[in-house]
């Protein structure tokens, strides 16, 4: 694959990042940063709105992002897709914590939209351990339609080092 060839040349391909990605692939420090719209079910319009909103200031947390974007062009499904694609990984919160707290966050967002005059404190998120590497790779496949960070075969290679001999070592 193209990604494997890039790795052979010591070029890292990074998943989309909520504060770095644009509408096109970018090269930075020998790394390729993927655009937001490679995420399944994230349109060019949604990606463009995220980038425009980010011009007012970087997103400082998932809740900061959700407050600024939810209900405009980003709904629960889009939030799930963005989380599963790992775009918030650089905001110091893991994907499982976000997914497991998402309904509570959305309730908070909808309540704060309805009650403008009252100050509503942000929800306190319950921490969860990050998904296993194999689960993250599955989520990556469902988010992009391809494996970006690793391929499941790599887990088997690492965990099941099998001694193999070349056919040249066998005599007839």
Located regions from the model:
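Sliding clamp-binding short linear motifs
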Residues: 4-171
């Amino acid at each position: 694959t193209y990604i494997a060839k890039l790795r052979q040349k010591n070029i890292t391909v990074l998943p989309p990042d909520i504060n770095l990605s644009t509408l096109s692939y970018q090269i930075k420090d020998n790394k390729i940063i993927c655009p937001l719209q490679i995420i399944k079910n994230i349109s060019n319009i949604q990606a463009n709105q995220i980038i425009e909103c980010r011009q007012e200031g970087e997103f400082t947390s998932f809740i900061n992002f959700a407050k600024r974007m939810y209900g405009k062009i980003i709904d629960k499904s889009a939030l799930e897709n963005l989380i599963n694609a790992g775009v918030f990984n650089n905001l110091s919160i893991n994907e499982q914590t976000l997914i497991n707290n998402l309904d509570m966050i959305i309730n908070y967002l909808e309540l704060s939209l309805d009650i403008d005059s009252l100050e509503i404190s942000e929800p306190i998120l319950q921490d969860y351990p990050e998904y296993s590497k194999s689960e993250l790779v599955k989520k990556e496949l469902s988010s992009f339609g391809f494996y970006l960070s690793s391929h499941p075969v790599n887990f088997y290679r690492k965990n099941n080092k099998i001694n193999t001999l070349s056919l040249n070592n066998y005599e007839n």
